[in-house]
């Protein structure tokens, strides 16, 4: 019965409309305003379906990241360790990491003092230097090298990768440059630079960065090739959008997750390279504390049961920083993927 009433009403309205159209505009002018305009009813479901989305990329990224409790816990711990490493020299009661402590009565050096004895929190080494001060100083040195290497590789690698993948005329040049650099082991270049130049923080940063960016560039290039000719990029080029704007607005946001992951992996890799180059005797001098120097010194006494703490503590710091950066980088990469933002 209800459907029949609706059909009859619809037919009646159609008949009236046909009559008005046949009579012309004069018939419409005679109608009162109430019959010409009818307010549309409000529907919450319809409004919700057509409303503006309040989506925020970075807001969704951080919400997804903070759901990973392990990554958040590691991030808090890593921030605490890094902050303490750089603030430690300014705390009260700290000593020079290169100071060789001696007994004020006998004048004998405090050699190989066990942790917790005579004011040495993590013990002392063979010449009486405080391992607590040296390990945190070494962490500062290694982290500084790693941060600068990651920053240089990211800036140079992203720039070269975008040009390599987006500008077709540069493809041959970057491909040949990649083939040349890729066929020379980065370890050999690092050893040569450390051997020719005097070992220093700047030398290590240069040696690690001089070829490290090429891997980032190739990775970015491959990602750019995937999205370069998608419809929205083709449309942007057709309407004359500047290349720089296309790169910044269309390409780089798509690559945030993979860039963050690569940078997070570069930091522990740089620390590992510093440890290796110091281990073979071409790294920083012993006057410059670094995790590589400390681990190398601890390796020499690791067979002596009472002195293994000299290898244990710097290894713990190195392992924690390496694992934390790796897991946090993976977690942030997953969180930055828009596919994981769906509720």
Show where each model-derived region lies.
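Gly/Trp-centered helix-boundary motif
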Residues: 1-154, 158, 162, 169, ...
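Hydrophobic core positions of alpha-helical segments in small-molecule transporters
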Residues: 75-77, 145-149, 177, 190, ...
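Generic hydrophobic transmembrane alpha-helix motif, especially the helices
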Residues: 121, 152-157, 162-230, 260
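Amphipathic cytosolic juxtamembrane alpha-helices at the membrane-cytosol interface
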Residues: 129-144, 148, 168-171, 175, ...
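Residue-level hotspots within the lipid-embedded alpha helices of multi-pass solute transporters
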Residues: 150, 209-212, 222-223, 262-267, ...
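Hydrophobic alpha-helical interface/terminus motif in multipass membrane transporters
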Residues: 160-164, 193, 220, 233, ...
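Intracellular coupling helices
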Residues: 178, 218-257, 333-342
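Non-cytoplasmic
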Residues: 191-192, 196, 200-205, 209-212, ...
